[in-house]
């Protein structure tokens, strides 16, 4: 039986062996649609199971995602060979998954270090303004970062209202989805395109009219709905003492500087063309991308070190959402290997 050190040496040898890369070529045109079933299964599980069997999903989503990943990886290894499976696994890990998770973590940490304080009243005008601001911010700090920054202020502003479900639903539509369409920072598929060589400003140059149209229509629908709902609210007694009013402001302002650093690091990795490339099991890792990822880790550490505990407590900052996202996207990135090859 191999000792642990021998297994480690074997694993490291495979990890840094570029020669197996030739086994990783996949002819996407010859693949059947059956190879896309695990990918569809992951997406359907994420969409349906939290609604149908929420307790099962909450406690076992990691196992379910792992099951779909293995449903792809094991047949892949059997059909194309272990070397091909290994090389594609390393490529998905180093070229796509790790950069994505590191960027998302940095944006999540930086956004979690900014707290918007102040007394807000959830009128249709204010709610619409918050959603519009969130739509803009989502393309620069990610849909996750913008959502984390603004969801609590808008919930606080509407806390006295008897019905605010539509506010959260439109928040998800506008801030958590449509708003992140203009830069690679906004949405995972756009960031993957950026990693593949798509220019940083391509989406802004080509789809800003479509994004503007979609966001304006959604904001208009929301304003009409929210105005109707607001007028049906029972009258609230105006017994708020002057001392209870708090001026609008920000805690953790240094994180805005760190947010600018995140944008600069991503831009740097796309602009700087370095000849220095590290070959890891057939996956080329360029120096700009490596420095970007290391820089993002440093930014996240600085944010955690400089942000007061009071701000994190006020934001109810925790790691569970990031752990969940990391597990889910691990399955997504693995099961998309064949789907991307077919495309």
Where are the predicted features?
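Transmembrane helical segments that form the transport core of multi-pass membrane transport proteins
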Residues: 259-343
């Amino acid at each position: 039986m191999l000792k642990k050190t021998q297994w480690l040496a074997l694993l490291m040898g495979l990890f840094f062996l570029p020669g197996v890369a030739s086994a990783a070529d996949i002819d996407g045109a010859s693949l059947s649609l059956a190879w896309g079933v695990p990918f569809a299964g992951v997406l359907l599980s994420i969409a349906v199971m939290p609604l149908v069997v929420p307790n099962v999903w909450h406690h076992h989503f990691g196992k379910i995602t792992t099951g779909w990943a293995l449903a792809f990886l094991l047949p892949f290894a059997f059909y194309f060979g272990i070397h091909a499976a290994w090389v594609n696994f390393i490529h998905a890990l180093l070229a796509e998954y790790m950069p994505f998770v590191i960027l998302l973590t940095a944006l999540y940490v930086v956004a979690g270090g900014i707290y918007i304080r102040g007394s807000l009243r959830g009128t249709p005008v204010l709610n619409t303004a918050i959603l519009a601001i969130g739509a803009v911010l989502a393309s620069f700090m990610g849909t996750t970062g913008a959502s984390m920054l603004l969801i609590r202020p808008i919930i606080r502003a509407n806390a006295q209202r008897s019905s605010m479900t539509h506010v959260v639903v439109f928040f998800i539509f506008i801030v958590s989805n449509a708003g992140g369409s203009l830069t690679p920072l906004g949405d995972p598929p756009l960031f993957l395109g950026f990693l593949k060589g798509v220019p940083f400003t391509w989406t802004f140059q080509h789809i800003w009219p479509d994004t503007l149209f979609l966001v304006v229509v959604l904001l208009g629908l929301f304003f009409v709905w929210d105005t109707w709902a607001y007028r049906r609210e029972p009258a609230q007694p105006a017994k708020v003492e002057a001392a209870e009013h708090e001026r609008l402001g920000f805690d953790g302002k240094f994180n805005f500087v760190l947010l600018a650093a995140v944008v600069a690091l991503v831009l740097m990795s796309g602009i700087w063309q370095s000849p220095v490339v590290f070959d890891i099991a057939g996956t080329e890792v360029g120096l700009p991308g490596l420095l970007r990822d290391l820089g993002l880790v440093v930014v996240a550490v600085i944010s955690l070190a400089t942000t007061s505990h009071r701000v994190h407590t006020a934001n109810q900052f925790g790691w569970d959402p990031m752990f969940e996202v990391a597990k889910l996207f691990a399955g997504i990135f693995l099961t998309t290997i064949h789907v991307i090859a077919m495309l």
